[in-house]
Amino acid sequence: MSNLFVRKATGLVRSWSVFDAFIYAFFSINIVTLGFYSFSQMYFFGGGMINALVVSAIFLIFEIIVYSSLIAVMPRSGGDYVWMTRIFGGGTGFILAITGWWFTLWLWTPIYGDMLRQFVITPLLGVLGQQDLALWFSGKGTPLFVSTLIALAFVSIVIALGMKTYARVQKYSFYAGMLGLLILIIMLFTGSQAAFKSGFDNNASALFGAQSGAYDATVQAGTDAGATTPISGGALNLVFLTLPWLVFFNLWPNWGATLYGEVRGATDYKRNFAGMAWALGAVTVLGIIFFLGVAKTIGWDFYMQANGAWWNYAWGYVTDKPPLPVWPYPALLTVFLTGNRLIQIVVILLMSFWWFGWAGTLFLSSTRVIFAAAFDRLLPEKVAELNKNGTPINAMLLMVLPAIVVSYLYAYNVGAAPDGTGGFYTATLAATQGIAIMYFGTAIAAIVLPYVKKDLFNASPIAQMKVAGIPLITISGLIFGGFLAFLLVEWMFDPWLNTGGEGAGLYGISFKNTNSIIFLLVCYILSAAIYYGFKAYRKRGGIDMDKIQTEIPVE
């Protein structure tokens, strides 16, 4: 086997504990960054948020079963890439995994940069009295590009320092962030709507220069934007319509699956399942508590109206800035309950650790997929090299350098019409779609694994896990795959809304958004070109790629 791969063993070390993997899963479905960000955009739905949160979690349990099972069978760095290439064969697995984990993640870079400024830079500058700079960072174009470059620098450094260092960073961030969230929840459940209204008007003016009466003006702006999403209730079909947007936040408890070649005890299915399931359960409960706290003190209707007012402007539907001229970050809104600047600074600082503990998820998982492909000789051997910290540094550069270009195109919306419509921004709406398509491929691989790789399955720790004689991994793959199929159909066609084929529907990534579709197709074509190009190149050198992708590499 040693002459098949780049070297005899990958050289990656199992330096993470199961608890480290739990924290990574917990941060991957981050209630603050991904959660608060996604919730704020979901102001125009008819299904209740609590209902949608619970329903999505039920389906995602089957995702966790699928990934925990595959990890136990093949606990190798590269995750989806390794599983699909070994179960399907090289071409399909490579194209789906490389598009999902490599090219699509470039599109997430400016989103991480946007969250850095909205969750950390702008609110901190505001409570520190730097009003002009805070307002500058909340603007479009250059402020977004600058914050994205800062985010990229942090992510690159923390990943380059290796898995042990990253584990410490995320662990300390976990404790600090949880303390901040606990303070936030206490403030929400002990405050009153009357105190919040007064505090909002005072702080919005003092910190960000809002006009007097900002609270009432926000109510009007949000109402005009169509803010209607309820905290709970709604017909079942309306709840299901909410899910394709909500999963931008919680579809990722498996995000660390590509790293399990570096996790101790990864062949233990129960430990794998527990780590991801506890993360999903904890985040779901925290989400419900957050919603209830918001409803008590901020007021649910006002929260949605503030969100609608901001995104109606940010998405270009109106040109006038909202009464609160910065994103309505829930932590910022909560500290408006007090005029004590020290308390505001401490809470915002503690809450910022939700971003710092999570930021590495941007590229950390992806580097292992690129590394695994290079180890299989489907990319240059240099990409499989490790630095002294055990990081595939060249694989990371293949994420970072293109991400800078993508972030520039996104921040300045290159190619947009004079009225601001279209442009590169619309192409990035496929950021979730491309990953979900890859997950669908992995779900299919899980379904067929017991039948096409019988010896491997029968020798695995999950061989006896069956329901009515059917492998649990197959049943779970069918359910999770069905859920993904629903999401993909909704994103592509919006069938319950666009009965006449009009508009882009609720999600903005239907077939009507040609930029997004073209971008995805180009990514798949590029992946196919890399695969078949390297396969032909290796064949000329006497290397059988089909043989390589029947073997499982040694870590």
Question: What do these predicted regions represent?
Answer:
Residues 1-48, 60-65, 200-218, 531-555:
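Membrane-interface "cap" regions at the ends of multi-pass membrane proteins
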Residues 12, 142-143, 155, 172, ...:
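C-terminal membrane-solvent junction of multi-pass transporters and transport-like membrane proteins
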Residues 16, 20-34, 148-154, 208-297, ...:
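Hydrophobic, membrane-embedded alpha-helices of multi-pass small-molecule transporters
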Residues 16, 145-211, 251, 273-282, ...:
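Membrane-interface loop-to-helix entry segments
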Residues 18-19, 142-149, 263-285, 356, ...:
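Loop-to-transmembrane helix boundary motifs in multi-pass membrane proteins
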Residues 41, 61-152, 362-366, 485:
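Hydrophobic transmembrane alpha-helices that form the core helical bundles
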Residues 51, 184-186, 190-194, 425-438, ...:
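A generic transmembrane alpha-helix motif of multi-pass inner-membrane proteins
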Residues 82-89, 219, 277-359, 379-427:
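TM-loop-TM module centered on a large, flexible mid-protein loop between adjacent transmembrane helices
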